[in-house]
Structures are given as C-alpha cells and as structure tokens.
Amino acid sequence: MEQKQRRFTKNIFVLDANAKTLCGRIAKLSSQPYCQIKIGRVIAFKPVKNPEPKGYVLNVPGPGAYRIQDGQDIISLMLTPHGVEATTERWEEWKFEGVSVTPMATRVQHNGVMVDAEIKYCKGMGIVQPYMRNDFDRNEMPDLPGVMRSNYDIRELRQKIKNERESAPRLQVQSVAPREESRWMDDDEAKVDEEAREMIPGTSRLEKLREARSNVFKEVAAGINWNLDEKDEEDGDEREDEERVKTLSDDDEQGEDASDDEHPKTHITKEYVEKVAKQIKLKDERFMSLSSAMPQASGGFDRMIVTKKLKWQNVPLYCFDESSKRYELQCVGACERVAFVSKDMSLIILRSAFRRL
C-alpha cells in the first residue's frame, strides 16, 4: 500500500488594491486589506486584517494566472473576477506567470499579540491571463537538430539506464596490508600515511604505489651499492671499496678483506628504502618536479628544501654543512630529523646526525 505524501499547509494572502479579482472584492466588502487562501488538508477562504507568520503575500494588479516559486514549493493560482482556483500539485495544461519570493523580517499581529515574524512577499504583473491553454504537448516530440526519438518512453528509459548501471561490474579492492604496516610506524608517520591514503582513491592509490615502486626506485633492493660512479672492476678500486666498508661499519672487528664471491656492503639499509618510499608516496608539491636519488657516502647538494621531524631507526646518518653544501656519512643508527635536499633535478633525503651552519 502506497503511503500518501504528507501535505503541508500553505497560506497565501492576496493583496488586490484595485479590487478587480474575487479576492479583492471580498476583502473590500469586509473592509480588510487581504484575502487569505489556505491550502492544505482543508481549504479556507476569508478576508483578514494582516498576514500570518511564514505566509505568502501576493500583490496583484488584477486577474491573472500566477505561480509562486519558493525553492521546492510551487503554488499555482487562477484569480478571476468571479472565482479562485489554487493548488500545490502539478498543473501544466495552463500557462502561468512565474513569481519569485522575497523573504522579509516584519512585525505583525498574531493571535492578538505583536510578534516578530518572517513573511514571503511576491509581486505579480498580470501578464498572463487566466486559463490560457499551454500549447506545448508533453507527449509530442519537438523537432530538434541532432536529436532522434527513442524507442522507449521516459519511464522505460530511466528504468533501462538504472538497470544497466546496477548490473555493471564494480571493481572493489580491499587492502589489508597498508593497515598492518601502519602498526609498526611511528605516530607521526602513521598519521601522514593515513591522510595520504584518504586523498587517493583505492584503485588509483594502488596504481600510484606500483608506479612509485617500479619507476622511482628502479627496482632497487637493499644491499646494492649506490656509489656507481666509484665502482670499477679493477683491483685498485676494489681496495677503495674495502676501505669505505671499513669506515661505514658499526663494528670495529669487521676489518677483513671482502672476497670476490661476496656482495659489496653498503650503507643503504632496507629500513631506509621503505621510509623513503613512504615519503615519496605523499606526493608533496615541493618534490613533484624532482626525481628520487640515493645519497652517496659523501657528496654535495644545490639547496635545502625542507627539514622534517621524523623518527627513523637503522638508517644511514649524515653530517651536512649548509654553508659549503656538502654532506658526509657518519654511521648507521637512529635519527629524529630528516633533511630534504636537491641535487640538479634529483631529490636526496638525508638523515641528520648533526649539521654545521
């Protein structure tokens, strides 16, 4: 059983100073300025002295077809010298003059007491005479350029579009891994990672993650020596690599010569690669034009972009000089401050042991 739509009462106070309509004549005979038309569960029609709060005051010069438009509310009235018709339902077979509403703050007498009230004032021009037939047939298709008549009527077409939309496959990706990763993050990193995840939709976020891992880091695995400019297969360069490994080692006992079968040791740790990956995924506008690069044991930079307070563990720590724009590896450990610097068109992330100004 369909539930009937709730009907709200509308109060229209017709002000016809010339007394050319039935409303104006009744008000004049009763020595009152207004004629009230109440539309709701019941219909009332009477002359009144003043409008009620939240009522519509319709000022008309004479007979006409008026349509009051107040947001979603539409009230259609036919005012003639001998009759009145009004409705809040659809009434499309006649032409109407659209009348806009202006809310006003006023003081009116209501139930014998002067109160502050809001009324809605609208003024008609009488340019549309009552009962002028609307020549537009809703069932007739007009001749429009580039438009052809459909084989469906409007209801069937809407239902067809709705069924197609509901039957279309929806890609739903549920990722649990990122939430598991956030359990092992520091509080500030987990908050930043969560905000970045909310800004990027699910499917787009996965694509960005794959792109960051494949393109930005170029399939880098922990343990690979990034000092490519210094790498050579000659015996002299092997001795230099061996001395550099001794400098970077935390343990003084790791002074043995590296054999040809072993991979060369490096200061780039797995934790560092993971932390940098998460920073790149944040898509900071200050870094968008720069490509990611790994720092060497020592080197230079062009400018300091920003310094962030982040707690990182088991990462290479650097001492960098802002005046000479040089940095140098000190050890592998924990830090609470990270510097973002640029070299040419590359972004380098340095964990700060301390710095010289």
Swiss-Prot record:
Residues 230-241, 250-260 have a biased composition (Acidic residues). InterPro entries: BTV_NS2, NS2_N. One of its GO terms (molecular function) is RNA binding. Keywords: RNA-binding. The keyword RNA-binding applies. The keyword Coiled coil does not apply. Residues 163-199, 228-267 are annotated as: Disordered. Single-stranded RNA-binding protein. Belongs to the orbivirus non-structural protein NS2 family. This is Non-structural protein NS2. It comes from Bluetongue virus 10 (BTV 10).
